[in-house]
Amino acid sequence: MARVCQVTGKAPMVGNKVSHANNRTKRRFLPNLQYRRFWVESENRFLRLRVSNAGLRLIDKNGIDAVLADLRARGEV
């Protein structure tokens, strides 16, 4: 499975690791993804999502029902 947040769409990005001597090597910055279960009251069931920390904050702000409606409109869930 891809390392992509199901709510925000955050994915790994590429950058440079910079040492003290200013040597640069390529590296990947991974999003902070967690599997979380959310209780959806309207469907009377749990929904398991792979979300980033920013996605969790978005769910706290807007509510799981609003986020779920947006995901269904995009065709992701």
Curated annotation (Swiss-Prot):
BP terms from Gene Ontology: translation
Q: Which UniProt keywords apply?
A: Ribonucleoprotein, Ribosomal protein
Classification via InterPro entries: Ribosomal_bL28, Ribosomal_bL28/bL31-like_sf, Ribosomal_bL28_bact-type, Ribosomal_bL28_sf
What disulfide bonds does the UniProt entry report for this chain? Answer: none
One Pfam family recorded for the sequence: Ribosomal_L28
Q: Which GO terms describe its cellular component?
A: cytosolic large ribosomal subunit
Single Gene Ontology MF annotation? structural constituent of ribosome
Assigned protein family: Belongs to the bacterial ribosomal protein bL28 family.
Q: What is this protein called?
A: Large ribosomal subunit protein bL28
Q: Which gene encodes it?
A: rpmB
